[in-house]
């Protein structure tokens, strides 16, 4: 997201600022995930040294070149999928994991946080989409990016154990 923000032109400064703010949110999210992982017995070393599965590699291979393009507004489609998924499913997943694995709230804090806070992330996205900067061409690219990211997210799960 920070890479994408650095490629948004000054004419779209409010969008650039939103991307930068969102990058900070996502950085804190990763720290929360790391804490949860350690709380269930994992280590930061494992996170740093375990290779990505092929679905994660595919997602990164798609996202980073997109973020490096001028005014990568199509990545709003990725945000729509990612934030929408968290908004709709994270609470259910937190409760299911707690029940099935007998976990404490502090071991699923990332999922619990998103159950309560992805509405604000999603609202920011909605504001951008309603701002008037999204032309027909941009809208088409946003939709295509959303479809690709949704498929690559599914691929990450399908390839969970395939490094």
Regions found by a protein language model. Give the residues of each.
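Non-heme di-metal
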Residues: 1-163
């Amino acid at each position: 997201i920070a890479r994408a923000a650095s490629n948004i032109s000054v004419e779209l400064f409010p969008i650039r600022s939103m991307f930068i703010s969102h990058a900070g949110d996502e950085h804190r999210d990763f720290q929360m995930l790391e804490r949860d992982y350690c709380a269930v017995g994992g280590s930061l070393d494992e996170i740093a040294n375990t290779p990505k599965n092929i679905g994660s590699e595919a997602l990164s291979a798609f996202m980073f070149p997109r973020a490096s393009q001028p005014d990568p507004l199509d990545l709003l489609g990725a945000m729509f999928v990612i934030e929408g998924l968290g908004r709709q499913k994270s609470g259910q997943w937190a409760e299911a994991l707690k029940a099935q694995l007998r976990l404490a709230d502090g071991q699923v804090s990332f999922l619990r946080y998103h159950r309560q806070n992805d509405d604000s992330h999603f609202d920011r996205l909605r504001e951008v989409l309603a701002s008037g900067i999204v032309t027909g061409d941009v809208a088409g690219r946003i939709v295509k990016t959303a479809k690709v990211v949704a498929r690559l997210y599914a691929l990450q799960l399908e390839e969970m154990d395939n490094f």
